């Protein structure tokens, strides 16, 4: 199958959903050589992946992941990465605030790729255990409204792809598949993308994957987040219907910050920023987290408009619930790991 796909791609012919799904499944079962995988990924990158190709590949990745069977709809807050902004861990900090506000969050992530600190790195630096089994993570979700699925453990078949990706050293379809391959099949999602051209295709892919409520965002200062330093382009998804809008800090009553104020560093540095935000320290990191938390809460609770969702995010931090959530997660993750 992969040989046929390579031939099609080199002729600039698109793959349909089924063929894309079959090829990625073949790759992730170890049935393709490194040379074949490298050729396939390079040819697809040159042609540029279509919605069918991305959706098929994401479906294959989901099917090969360790199962994580949730009992209720959950929310994912994630960025594609690759924006080269070196911002602190905005999505992860936002996820903790949203969980503290009562929304079940299933965060899927990894260690750093293009940044100095990935979601796994900063959660570990905060004292949260990340290497939990699915059963332990499900128990943590029930206790705390938050679970982290470490991509390396849930997508073990990615080991078949790693050598070819390292050898060809170019961005491939796998750079955008991670945020689409949440093992919990989250029905709600705040998805940040590193390039504006990816917004519309990935919005369509989310709908095909069964996501009911979502926002796909890209800020004009290049973040794969909603930015407190620039306007952010947004596609809102509600049961397959899409609406585009622009969000600015001023709409939330905030003063626009300099992009430099959002830059982080190592996992330890970013963990300190996260703690400061969760304990109510004012400044640009708090502002950007509040904006993203407002969007996420609006996705999860559509009855709240953005202004009400922003107020809920503020209350969650200022009344101590966010800091308490972090303390609970540290204690509970250690407890479930020991059980």
From Swiss-Prot:
Which amino acid positions bind Mg(2+) 2, per UniProt?
Answer: 224-225
Q: Which residues cross the membrane?
A: none
Q: So, what pathway does this thing act in?
A: Amino-acid biosynthesis; L-tryptophan biosynthesis; L-tryptophan from chorismate: step 2/5
What the protein does comes down to: Catalyzes the transfer of the phosphoribosyl group of 5-phosphorylribose-1-pyrophosphate (PRPP) to anthranilate to yield N-(5'-phosphoribosyl)-anthranilate (PRA).
Subunit structure as annotated in this protein's UniProt entry: Homodimer.
| Catalytically driven reaction(s) | N-(5-phospho-beta-D-ribosyl)anthranilate + diphosphate = 5-phospho-alpha-D-ribose 1-diphosphate + anthranilate
> InterPro entries per the record?
Anthranilate_Pribosyl_Tfrase (IPR005940), Glycosyl_Trfase_fam3 (IPR000312), Glycosyl_Trfase_fam3_N_dom (IPR017459), Glycosyl_Trfase_fam3_N_dom_sf (IPR036320), Nuc_phospho_transferase (IPR035902)
Query: Gene3D superfamilies, from UniProt?
Result: Nucleoside phosphorylase/phosphoribosyltransferase catalytic domain (3.40.1030.10), Transferase, Pyrimidine Nucleoside Phosphorylase, Chain C (1.20.970.10)
Enzyme class, spelled out: transferase
This chain's protein is named: Anthranilate phosphoribosyltransferase
* Keyword set, alphabetical order: Amino-acid biosynthesis, Aromatic amino acid biosynthesis, Glycosyltransferase, Magnesium, Metal-binding, Transferase, Tryptophan biosynthesis
The record lists Mg(2+) 1 as bound by 91, 225
**Protein transport: is it a keyword of this entry?**
no
Q: Which cofactor does it need?
A: Mg(2+)
EC number(s) on file: 2.4.2.18
Concerning Pfam families, the annotation shows: Glycos_trans_3N (PF02885), Glycos_transf_3 (PF00591)
Positions annotated to bind anthranilate 2: 165
Q: Quote one Gene Ontology molecular function term.
A: anthranilate phosphoribosyltransferase activity
Organism field: Lactiplantibacillus plantarum (strain ATCC BAA-793 / NCIMB 8826 / WCFS1)
Signal peptide limits: none
Q: Which gene encodes it?
A: trpD
Q: Where does 5-phospho-alpha-D-ribose 1-diphosphate bind?
A: 79, 82-83, 87, 89-92, 107-115, 119
